[in-house]
Amino acid sequence: MKNTTEEKREAIPNSVSRMLLAGIGVLLQVLWIFWLALKLNDYSTAIQVCTSVLTFLITLRIYGLHINSAYKISWIILILLFPIFGLTIYLLFGRSGAVSVMRRRFGENLTMLRRYHAPILQQRRALPYPDRITRNHARYLQDCAGYPAYDNTDVTFYGDTCEALEAQKTALHSAEKFIFMEYHAIEDASAWQEVEDILAERAAHGVEVRVFYDDVGSIGFINSKFVKKLAGRGIQCRRFNPVIPILNVFMNNRDHRKITVVDGRVGFTGGYNLAEEYFNRTHPYGQWKDSGIRLEGDAVRGLTLIFLELWGATQKAAPEVERYLPDVPYTARENAVVLPYADNPLDDEATGENVYLNMIRSAKDYVYITTPYLILSDEMQRTLRLAASSGVDVRIITPGIPDKKLIFSVTRSYYASLAKSGVRIYEYAPGFIHAKQCVADGTEAVVGTINFDFRSLYLHFENACWFCGCSAVADVRRDFDALFPVCREVTQEYADTRSLAVRGWDCVLRLFSPLM
């Protein structure tokens, strides 16, 4: 087996060539569509009429969709201003989850997996919720999203991803039956190699090991031999939605989930991927800040079923489920209520956004949020502003050093309206904050993969964990308390009236921000 350095040298050119091939292939096909449309326009006014009719019909179709209004308006404006370009881009990339084969497979698999959630949902036990508000928030996730709440579970919060990785490796070492790992990005470098060696050692002892990664998320980090390399070490590995040089409307929907499950008894999730910068082994954007949680107990069942959602949807045969849901004896130390949940772009339920909205609307004292990207719907903006205007201490932490400069400009374009309503905005001065966490009133918290942006809330496959009634909620709050002193508060800077040119540019950015 090649060492890590050699693997890394191969990964970069290999990935660049794959991206270039895919990009050139897609670009040529898009240009061909434009050329064909323009040539047809030259020969017949009937084509122009057809284009106008199609523009009108597609616009009506978009307007009638049960999706966020800002998302609809951005597409409608683009199509009306540039009909051929707008129609082409929308038909290729704007229809979330439009591929019928994947929609059917995912839907069938999800329906099958719901049967394993059903017994927990039907029990409706009197779980130890701190108050009526948290009970209602859990009820939404159970009744509308189909994910049950669990007790008899301990939650450990990690504000330091190095600690999270060490805990994860310890859990992997203890595996006796199976290991499931699903990540948006895996980098074949030192952090992953430490994990891979443990996986290979466990596989050699008869443990079933599955690794699932998103092809776009990992394309700059691993080479095309990665799957074969893992197979040679006894590890099952699959890519989600592989990049191909052919137009594919599903290519815009990525697997952004981060899950590890060991034997159905221990699970991990959070914002961090298995790449070097997440553990500050490299520093492309200054200090990297992320977070995660460890679950032990009954709620790991929910995390296991979430992993099987996409793993099962990428195969034709129905996945085996029962043997991955063992009845593991466990007695929790705390009376927590824990609810792992997921979101996907193939239905009309904006689960991730609704959980955040519920927490913000119900907050009485404070709600604190971290997100790497801040691209908000009108409803989310109104909810944040209303909470702040009603006396709730609303604070949002975003990066101080961006990984994407255009998206950072879009993020900042939302500051002014929020700051003027009393929302306090902080930028993480040491570098890039990638954590996706929210805590409200010291009673409930969410840690997971879901950013406050349109891609996370509407286009990607995501997961998170909501929990209450345990010390981990206070740990999340303490993490915020440690963050604020190292952040730069920019509230007043953006609350003050700025120049007309700056305000105009912000409007342009926000107009098309849902498409970014």
Question: Language-model features: where?
Answer:
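Short glycine/threonine-rich loop-to-helix capping motif typified by GTGT followed
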Residues: 382, 408-412
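N-terminal localization/anchoring segments of enzymes in phospholipid and broader phosphate metabolism
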Residues: 1-354, 358, 362, 402, ...
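Active-site donor-binding acidic/aromatic loop of nucleotide-activated sugar
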Residues: 425-429
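A short, conserved beta-strand element enriched in hydrophobic/aromatic residues
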Residues: 290, 370-371
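Glycine- and other small-residue-rich loops at beta-strand/loop junctions that grip anionic moieties
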Residues: 184, 372-373, 407
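Catalytic-core elements of nucleic-acid end-processing and repair enzymes
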Residues: 436
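Helical hairpin unit composed of two closely spaced alpha helices linked by a short loop
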Residues: 363, 373-395, 399, 404
